[in-house]
């Protein structure tokens, strides 16, 4: 009953946000609202089903979740019910699970190594494995069991539907591989890849599996020389994964977050940075380090020679085009891409070893995730930056002045879903002088193209059902000056969803009609934490909240990595790769410049005092900011 009420309230908020006049909705709008409610109800039923099953002490067979997956009709899995493989969904899943999943039949979930050990699993002694496109700590026992560390409920909302989707597609392939006995025999022939016969067999197998040449090539990129052996593993066994949750509690998630924070707090103390102003950035661990340290730029000649050797044909071609002016890309971005690839070669090992030392000399310290959450972090001491080493695009007049007392950046690899709330809350609990919170992450765009950059000033959080209205500190001009391939979409509305597979077409259509065009997973949880940093109560549920004025800077940037309205163009079908660096770095540069300009000017000191005073006045008044429903005049967004 409560879930239905929350769903209706959410639908009403979506209608109000779209500007629909109360009591005057047309018949088709009513039908759309009902369709949205039905889509939401099926998603909620799916979530409740697996959450209920995971509360038990035993193992859960995922076969029992297949029908709920079908009913939810995930937009990421449009042909789940079809007999032919959904290659987009299949590729999405294998990119987000370790390759050891092909050898596994059981998956264990736990919050800490102590929890695993208490249940008889010494996972730290197992083989550490990783997925290509999802950061998570995985361990494989070498037989048939995978273990994953979970940081929040968002991890279960991610892992469970992904495993169910893989099982559905696995069993389609299993049936097709065994429909004709000669298919498995062909794969068992072990023909050399260089042989002409290999290409002929591949063509026959590909056509029998209904896989396009383009998708087959993607499988070759993911599995390399193991495409045939991977298909053999699928063909030999019909899959019914079992899943077991070991313990799992709210306190456990809090404990994991504090264990994650421990090494960061220790380094803060060792570097004596505790009394300095702090800027929190959620992005990745390569962007700011590259922009601030200059390690790649100082090796320009070395990296250029590496690119032109042809070890990577793409780098070779792109380097030549950039050199002769026939490619529109940015040379600095190219160097960062080349440096990443160079570090992976034997010739680049000297660079890989010296890089951390050079970065630390320039104030960039790396804190790898060893305990708790699998979220790497960086501490960047702005007082140690060397202006001549900065990327030219972030250089700011005045950086050569005395730097004593300058701020510190805490930069983290962006977390998944509700882990964002726990991370930012931990930071805000432990550091008093936070001057800015800047969030950069991937998102689905409903009205743009892959590589576009979106700036939102409204965020609807599906977790808390809160709608946040904020004054985003970034504008289109901050991004567009360094964006080559994409476009900047300003004044967007974002919705933070529960998971990639927990969205369906009715869900997305309803939000799109209500002008919500950015779909992601972290902004809402981050804003829930911001709420708790300025009020004496926990974040509410189902409220409209005005963040137009805050005691610190707030910026929100997303770059489009997914377009669900173009079938097959999700992250499973193609990744941002080199071209995605364009939007990522344009956004990172905007964040870096924003921070450096504040440090140099010092002009925001008075503004911060004014905002703090305004906040104090509001607290002494209503106690609930923005309790009324925003109207059509875009309240909640302060004029610049």
Specify the residue positions occupied by each region the protein language model found.
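Accessory terminal and edge-of-domain segments that mediate assembly/interaction
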Residues: 2-626, 630-631, 635-640
């Amino acid at each position: 009953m409560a879930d239905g009420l929350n769903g209706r309230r959410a639908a009403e908020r979506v209608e109000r946000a779209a500007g629909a006049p109360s009591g005057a909705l047309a018949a088709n709008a009513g039908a759309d609202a009902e369709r949205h409610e039905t889509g939401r109800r099926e998603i909620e039923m799916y979530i409740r089903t697996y959450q209920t099953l995971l509360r038990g002490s035993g193992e859960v067979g995922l076969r029992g979740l297949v029908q709920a997956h079908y009913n939810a009709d995930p937009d990421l899995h449009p042909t789940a019910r079809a007999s032919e493989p959904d290659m987009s969904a299949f590729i999405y899943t294998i990119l987000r699970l370790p390759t050891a999943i092909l050898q596994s039949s059981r998956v264990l979930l736990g919050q800490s190594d102590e929890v695993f050990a208490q249940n008889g699993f010494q996972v730290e002694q197992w083989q550490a494995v990783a997925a290509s496109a999802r950061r998570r700590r995985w361990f494989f026992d070498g037989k048939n069991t995978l273990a994953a560390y979970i940081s929040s409920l968002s991890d279960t909302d991610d892992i469970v539907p992904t495993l169910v989707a893989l099982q559905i597609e696995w069993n389609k392939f299993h049936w097709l591989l065994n429909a004709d006995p000669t298919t498995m025999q062909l794969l068992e022939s072990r023909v050399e890849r260089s042989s002409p016969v290999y290409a002929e067999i591949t063509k026959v197998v590909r056509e029998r599996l209904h896989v396009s040449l383009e998708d087959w090539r993607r499988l070759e990129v993911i599995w390399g020389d193991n495409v045939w052996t991977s298909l053999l593993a699928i063909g030999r066994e019909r899959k019914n994964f079992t899943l077991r949750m070991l313990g799992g509690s709210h306190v456990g998630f809090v404990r994991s977050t504090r264990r994650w924070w421990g090494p960061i707090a220790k380094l803060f103390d060792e570097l004596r940075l505790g009394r300095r102003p702090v800027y929190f950035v959620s992005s990745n661990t390569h962007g700011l380090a590259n922009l601030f340290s200059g390690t790649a730029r100082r090796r320009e000649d070395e990296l250029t020679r590496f690119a032109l050797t042809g070890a990577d044909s793409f780098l070779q071609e792109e380097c030549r085009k950039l050199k002769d002016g026939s490619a529109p890309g940015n040379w600095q971005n190219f160097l960062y891409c080349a440096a990443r690839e160079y570090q992976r070669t034997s010739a680049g090992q000297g660079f890989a070893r010296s890089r951390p030392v050079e970065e630390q000399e320039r104030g960039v310290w790396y804190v790898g995730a060893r305990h708790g959450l699998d979220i790497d972090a960086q501490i960047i001491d702005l007082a140690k930056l060397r202006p001549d080493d900065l990327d030219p695009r972030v250089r700011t007049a005045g950086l050569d002045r005395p730097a004593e007392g300058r701020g510190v950046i805490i930069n983290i690899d962006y977390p998944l879903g509700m882990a964002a709330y726990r991370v930012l809350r931990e930071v805000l609990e432990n550091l008093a002088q936070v001057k800015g919170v800047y969030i950069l992450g991937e998102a689905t765009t409903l009205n743009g193209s892959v590589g576009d950059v979106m700036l939102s000033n409204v965020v609807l959080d599906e977790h808390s059902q809160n709608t946040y209205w904020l004054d985003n500190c970034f504008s289109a001009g901050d991004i567009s000056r360094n964006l080559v391939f994409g476009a900047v979409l300003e004044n967007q509305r974002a919705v933070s969803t529960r998971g990639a597979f927990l969205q369906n077409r009715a869900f997305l259509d309803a939000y799109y009609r209500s002008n919500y065009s950015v779909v992601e997973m972290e902004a809402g949880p981050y804003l829930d934490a911001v709420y708790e940093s300025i009020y004496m109560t926990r974040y509410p549920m189902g409220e409209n909240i005005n963040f137009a004025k805050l005691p610190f800077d707030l910026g929100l940037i997303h770059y489009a990595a997914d377009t669900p309205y173009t079938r097959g163009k999700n992250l499973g079908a193609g990744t941002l790769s080199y071209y995605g660096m364009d939007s990522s770095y344009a956004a990172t540069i905007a964040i870096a410049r924003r921070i450096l300009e504040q440090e140099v000017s010092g002009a925001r000191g008075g503004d911060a005092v004014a905002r703090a005073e305004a906040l104090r006045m509001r607290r002494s008044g209503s106690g609930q900011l923005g309790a009324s429903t925003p109207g059509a005049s875009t309240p909640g967004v302060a004029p610049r």
